[in-house]
Regions:
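OB-fold single-stranded nucleic acid-binding module
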Residues: 26-217, 293, 381
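Charged, low-complexity intrinsically disordered terminal segments
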Residues: 305-378, 385-398, 419-663, 672-677, ...
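Surface-exposed, short loops/turns at beta-strand junctions within beta-sandwich domains
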Residues: 179, 273-281, 703-709
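C-terminal outer-membrane/trafficking sorting elements
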Residues: 1, 7, 15-19, 249, ...
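Short, surface-exposed linear motifs at loops/turns and structural transition points
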Residues: 215-306
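Structural beta-strand segments of beta-rich domains
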Residues: 41, 232-236, 664-668
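Residue-level detector of functionally pivotal "anchor" positions at catalytic/ligand-binding pockets or at interdomain
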Residues: 27-29, 214-222, 643-666, 731
């Protein structure tokens, strides 16, 4: 029986033969969105776009929105106009994260020229599943880059937050000038995320130039930045497009209730909150008022500095190269890092919280048992999918909570909190190492120790969110892991003279925070990563490299599924594949501008691998340490890892080789004492890119055709010895 398709002014008649599949009751869109993929639903809504977005349509009622795509097997003729009220029937489908009805099994146009739903006013960070398929509005948006709109994805920012818009090839905005000033952006919240499961990729789809409204109201033109952190208080600073008041609502709870600031009009705003006390957590929201308009910042939890000035120390479990030190030699605890961890646990006098992915070391477990014996309250969280066989040696008085609903790597944290309530003895142990024999003794890892009460209290908040309460025993019914967690901790801490940032995954947008720092690197980025599959961070590295930043690193496995290794090396970035070594390179760190006096030397480290799952489903902890001494120590560790590939190494004996110039460009002169039989240049993946036979002690290589970057020089001498050295070609 043929499908009846509406002529202008007519409605679709659903054929009798389809009725058995369509007898499910009419649903509002919010209810329909809860049904299983593949369920046939019937919904009614107002169409919020026309052909400007292609053949897809978005429908919205008073409860939610949804996409409708007339894919293969759809009835013909589905092309309703914006403002029409339409009833649609079809199965639910998930397309790269976007929930849609596809195919269209039947539809009726019920009415036309209806007013569109009012857009939901939100911030970039509030784009998400709750508003997918709905009209949204983000005020005070600035587009980056200038020029004209390209097809594909572009980025906009508002109140210091970033989000994408997407324009398909046939969109009317493609080729139009990008607004130079602030605009209020209107569009439909959509999603494009190829991950499994898809949890990100939310974007705004403007429908035309009318969705870019010049902003005539006061808006924030920057994020709210916490500065001047002291034990007594801190200052919040921000800027607006128009002159308005400088005010902050604040309080000990999210209800706020107290106010500070000035009504004097200004564009650059600064409000000091004082009298708060040391290691105090305060909820605050900055805002500026101009007439009847108010520009709001986000409500955020902030911390004052601790009463006792703290410090940051770093210990590595493998060799370091102190010859490159610019001040403080790095500490290598070869074979004894478990003893170092146990020694800090021995400091605990009142409380000890442990959240570690996997444990097989009895020295550490013994130190925890000793802490319990001297009256310390001990709590432990671990990943339930792991063996954790050393936990069988824990005293029965130590409660252990396992995360058992674990996609990805699950409870992947590696941290210990000691005496968080003691201003003089509060410590946090973090870094990349699990408490396993392999991680502690073989696999290159780092241990970061921070003595600071405010940071310890923040880590305790995170621990107790997973623990399910504040008591000595876990409350599994209340515990939150993974995507159920909230962004409930401060992020900036003044530890002595060092600024330390703290982020927990997946609630805190850790990948975004890492990218923000990569985007402002001035001169150098060194990486030591277990895995690199996160495309957002890949793109940041590519952009930094294109901007002249020297990007180089070591990655444990270049061939891991989804690896970005070869994308980066093909762009000229110096990366080394560690997979040939028997141990795992387990680090997750980046060093930025370690020797740049005009930059901000910092280190990003913790449990957070540079992967999609680390940012979206795993429990992770990350520290960003702004300190030139710490950056210098990590660079000493990184140099030792790099030297495993590129330092002068020799097979079958010893003997020096010399190269000139450094770096080389059109040519490279190589000299070896015992005479050269053959010289080879290998790129960072081990591929031979140049080979020359030699007869004397010196050989000239022609290298103009080679790409700039790092190479391994391999020299075979007459004696039979083979020497290797790192060489660099100038860009």
């Amino acid at each position: 029986m043929p499908i009846a398709v509406p002529l202008p002014g007519m409605r679709v008649l659903l054929p009798f033969l389809l009725l058995p599949a369509l007898l499910n009751a009419q649903s509002d869109i919010a209810e329909a969105r809860t049904y299983a993929i593949g369920s046939v639903v019937t919904i009614t809504g107002i169409v919020t776009n026309g052909p400007e977005l292609g053949s897809i349509r978005y429908l919205q009622d008073g409860t939610a929105g949804i996409a409708v795509f007339p894919g293969s097997s759809s009835v013909p003729g589905f092309a309703p106009a914006s403002g029409q009220e339409v009833q649609v029937t079809g199965p639910l489908k998930l397309f790269n994260g976007l929930l849609e009805i596809d195919p269209v099994m039947g539809f009726q146009v019920l009415s036309s020229n209806n007013p569109l739903p009012a857009p939901q006013l939100l911030t970039p960070n509030e784009l998400g599943e709750d508003v997918e398929g709905m009209l949204v509005r983000v005020n005070g948006c600035q587009f980056t880059g200038g020029g004209t709109f390209p097809s594909g994805t572009s980025t906009f920012s508002s109140i210091g937050q970033n989000a994408p818009i997407y324009l398909w090839n046939g969109h009317s905005l493609v080729g139009d000038p990008v607004p130079g000033g602030l605009v209020d952006l209107i569009g439909i919240c959509s999603q494009y995320d190829t991950g499994n499961p898809p949890v990100g990729g939310y974007q705004v789809l403007p429908r035309g130039s009318g969705d870019l409204v010049p902003s005539t109201t006061i808006n924030l033109t920057s994020g709210v930045e916490q500065q001047a952190i002291t034990p007594d208080g801190f200052t919040l600073s921000w800027s607006t497009n128009l002159a308005g008041s400088s005010e902050v609502a604040w309080g000990p709870t999210p209800a706020l209730g107290s106010f500070a600031g000035s009504g004097t009009p200004a564009i650059a705003h600064s409000v000091a909150l004082t009298g708060l006390g040391p290691a105090a957590f305060v909820h605050a929201r900055a805002f500026s008022v101009l007439g009847s308009d108010t520009a709001w910042g986000e409500r955020t939890l902030y911390s004052t500095a601790s009463a006792v000035p703290g410090w940051v120390r770093v210990v590595f479990n493998r060799e370091v190269d102190t010859s490159v030190s610019q001040g403080t030699p790095a500490v290598s605890a070869l074979g004894s890092i478990a003893d170092s961890i146990a020694a800090y646990i021995d400091l605990a006098q009142s409380t000890l919280d442990v959240a570690v992915y996997n444990t097989s070391n009895y020295t550490i477990v013994g130190a925890v048992n000793d802490a319990l014996a001297r009256g310390v309250q001990v709590r432990w969280i671990a990943e339930g999918a792991n063996a954790n066989f050393a936990l069988s040696a824990l005293n029965n008085g130590v409660p252990v909570l396992y995360r058992t609903n674990s996609p990805g790597s699950g409870m992947h944290n590696k941290f210990v909190v000691i005496d968080a309530d003691d201003p003089a003895n509060a410590h946090v142990l973090s870094g990349s190492t699990n408490f396993t024999q392999g991680n502690l003794f073989d696999d290159p890892n780092n241990l970061v120790i921070v003595r600071d009460q405010a940071l310890a209290l923040a880590y305790t908040l995170e621990f107790e969110e997973m623990w399910g309460g504040t008591g000595p025993q876990p409350v599994p019914a209340n515990s939150r892991f993974g995507e159920d967690k909230t962004d409930n901790t401060p992020h900036r801490f003044q530890v002595g003279g060092t600024l330390v940032e703290s982020f927990f995954s997946p609630s805190d947008g850790t990948t975004h925070a890492i990218r923000e720092h990569l985007d402002v690197a001035q001169s150098s980025i060194e990486l030591a990563l277990f895995i690199l599959t996160e495309n957002t961070l890949r793109d940041a590295l590519l952009e930094a490299h294109a901007d002249g930043v020297w990007v180089r690193g070591v990655v444990d496995d270049a061939n891991a599924p989804g690896s970005d290794f070869f994308t980066l090396t093909s762009a000229g970035i110096d990366l080394y594949d560690h997979s040939a070594f028997p141990e795992l390179l387990h680090h997750k760190y980046a060093i930025l501008d370690h020797s740049d006096p005009g930059g901000d030397p910092l280190v990003i480290t913790g449990s957070h691998n540079w992967t999609f799952s680390a940012n979206t489903v795993n429990d992770e902890n990350t520290l960003i340490i702004h300190d030139p001494a710490v950056a210098d120590q990590f660079f000493q560790e990184w140099t030792a890892r790099r030297d495993a590939f590129t330092g002068v190494a020799e097979v079958g004996g010893k003997g020096p080789i010399a190269t000139w110039p450094v770096p080389f460009h059109e040519g490279l002169q190589v000299t070896a004492d015992d005479g050269i039989v053959e010289v080879r240049l290998l790129d960072t993946t081990g591929r031979i890119v140049l080979a020359e036979a030699g007869q004397g002690p010196t050989i000239q290589l022609r290298t103009a055709h080679l790409a700039g970057g790092g190479y391994v020089l391999e020299v075979r001498e007459r004696s039979g010895r083979t020497l290797r050295s790192n060489v660099v070609k100038a860009p």
